[in-house]
Amino acid sequence: MKRKLKWIAVALVAGFALLQLTNPSRTNPLVVRDLMAANPPPPPIAAMLHAACYDCHSSETRWPWYSHVAPMSWLIAHDVTEGRQHLNLSVWPGDDPVRAVKLLDKMSDAIGNGEMPLDKYTKLHADARLTEVQRKELTDWLDGESARLKSGVGK
């Protein structure tokens, strides 16, 4: 019985080691035009956006140590890829106010409804947890930027 457990343990360790050879790409593509460059927020709003949104929705992802360990590396790379596909704050449509308004409204709705940031993210990133007051401040800013763009008023 002990011999069988030993072989099982060796096989599991070897399998885990082999998994490490298949790490996905963890890249941060070039920032084209950032939301905060196009629509500079006040410092507290900028800090909230960076903490709660930028790891999954920008080219400024902070890759934690566990993003280098399979199978977590696959899950994190998938989540970041999916997040960037839905909304990439590093590729902001500054020259397309109609699209920018849609994205700002989508962000405001997701944050205001508590859909974002995702619970699975905030469990490991306490700085990304938003209080109700912070959610209100953030959605007020997003709604204000949306209204400003709708009215065609520049900064």
What spans do the regions from the language model cover?
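Extracytoplasmic electron-transfer domains, predominantly the class I c-type cytochrome c fold
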Residues: W74-L124
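Electrostatic cytochrome c docking/interface patches
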Residues: N28-L49
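C-terminal capping alpha-helices of c-type cytochrome domains
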Residues: G114-E115, T122-V153
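Extracytoplasmic/secreted proteins, especially bacterial periplasmic and envelope-associated proteins
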Residues: P44, M48, P71, L75, ...
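Acidic helix-start/capping segments at beta-turn-to-alpha-helix junctions
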Residues: W63-H78
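The canonical Cys-X-X-Cys-His
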Residues: L49-T61, M116, L138
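Hydrophobic membrane-insertion alpha-helices, especially the h-region
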Residues: K6-N23
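A charge-rich, low-complexity, intrinsically flexible signal that marks solvent-exposed coils, linkers
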Residues: N28-V32, H86, I111, L149
